[in-house]
Amino acid sequence: MKLVIAEKPSVAQSLAAVIGATARKDGYLEGNGWRVSWCVGHLAGLADADSYDPKYAKWRYDDLPILPEHWQMVVGKDKKKQFDVLKKLINAPDVTEVVNACDAGREGELIFRSVYELAGCQKPMKRLWISSMEDSAIREGFANLRPGVDYDGLRDAALCRAKADWLVGINATRLFSVLYHRTLNIGRVMSPTLALIVQREAEIDTFKQVPFYTVALELPGLTVSGERMADKAAAEQLKEACQGAAATIKKVECKEKSEKPPALYDLTTLQRDANRLLGFTAQQTLDYLQSLYEKKLCTYPRTDSRYLTGDMADSLPVLVNLVANAMPFRKGIAITCDPQTVINDKKVTDHHAVIPTRNLKDADLSALPAGEKAVLELVALRLLCAVAQPHIYSETVVIATCAGRKFTAKGKTVKHPGWKALEDAYRAKMKDAEPKKEGAEKALPELTEGQILSVAAAIVNEGKSSPPQHFTEDTLLSAMETAGKEDMPEDAERKGLGTPATRAGILEKLVSAGFLERKKSRKTVQLLPSHDAVSLITVLPEQLQSPLLTAEWEYRLGEIERGQLAPEEFLDGISTMLKDLVGTYQVIKGTEYLFTPPREVVGKCPRCGGEVAELQKGFFCQNDSCRFAIWKNNKWWAAKKKQPTKAVVSALLNDGRVRVIGLYSEKTGKTYDATVVLEDDGQYANFKLEFDQRKGGSR
């Protein structure tokens, strides 16, 4: 009997169906010589600090740094039941071999190995390594199970990553929390990511716009523009000199150019496009893609490759054809397939690029949740574009002179749309599709060198230098991928912050910790640092906020994975850094009030007329002699399964009432809408409901 352990129940069921383990048992499936069970994510993890010594339960400066000599793994209390099932199955006398079928990546390896080792197992171990949940891929994977020891490097890298996160998180968080008298969560990758955002905001705040001027000349059939000028008076003078004069065509240059199709998606580039085009967060895109993977409609999500392997070349045209037939936006567009544009064995390590599967042919795409369908269409579009013909166009550059100054114009004529026909068709169906800029692809009239044209009008256009842009998830993911180095060549070996598999989770942790705020601005959602984020980066030393140093650590984890670096050497470096940090760091003078956020006033106090501001536990009058308060855990609101928000309290203070939707009735168990009225008796803030008045906006 062979035991297969998957990462989650849904995957276990898919595997079991293919290998014939169809009989349901308590916590596993069985049949055809196989037992198939599952983890529920990480069943075990590194023990807390107080497991090594009870004194570590309290945070004290004198105990730092905490550096375990012998690491302990413990099973989570809420995961013990499933661990016990797996332990019993692993150690069953009739089980001769254990197959690791957890996700084919660093974390999947650690999930399985933790269970395998805590169960005390020494039985032969094999690895199922697949990039698709299609039945054919599963059958092929089981026919070619690999020796488990081949992935010892992957396990070592995953465990070192977990230990490094533990060491930095435990020691740095305790050190700075004790020194600055408040909880400051610090992470090995979180903090340098936050530093990128804080640095960008500082650049925006200190940016000074500089005006510039250009002179444009209206000629028959085209407009030519001069170079930027810093002096407005000089621009006006040039305008006057050109007005009514003649311009001479000095040069006409026409070149045929070709724009290659884009590469296929890896996880990060898909997350970036899904954020830019669809407004999805990185985590949402990963969740949608993971679901599509488990539904056998897309290949493995957590990949860092943008290419396919040579053995996929022959079957690719069939896949491209069925994907094209399933996508409504490609109607009327001829589909071509050049497999060689996406095949590169040297650029595929663990998993190939994200592509749709052949199961798309029989799938009811209309039944998919909207988010999954949108991501699937994006993945399908990229496959069709990547194997399509190049976009070919001719570009004409005209240089003219007038009043002794040079003016230029560019024109573009599309010769063959190639892959861009698909992209244009996809964008045209989007609700928020941006209209094409006028003149962006406008052809220029036939001109000859030496030709003289009259100037119909001369205009001075004023512009201003642009500040750096606020980060969006699209641009932040790009910065994380290159550790903030904007000029890194595409083919350079990446030393980034985190991995494709972890970046989405890092962003979500920063948001949930209150360090980042998502703020919508027009069609984009910006990532803005909070007051606490700026304060934290102000006091953190370079080694904890340097993107380049953290990226170097990530690169060394890759070396461990490849067997090029001993885990002990990596962890010794982390420990040495922490010893130095604890021994040398001193509180920065003048930062006593750094972590006291400015209090936002939400309204006037109904008792004394003072200002009411939001604090952590509620909304309080800032007049020291006044006791007015609306607590966030107010029992009246809690009974209705609501919490007074800033918008609700502001309306109550300013209007005395607010319309609230979705209030819960303890009597009926249903929800209802009503107007909440504030009644203050001088001692307590009370509330009552009105059902016949609808004053105030809904909240």
Q: Positions of the model-derived regions?
A:
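Metal- or metallocofactor-binding catalytic centers and their adjacent structured scaffolds
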Residues: 233-265, 271
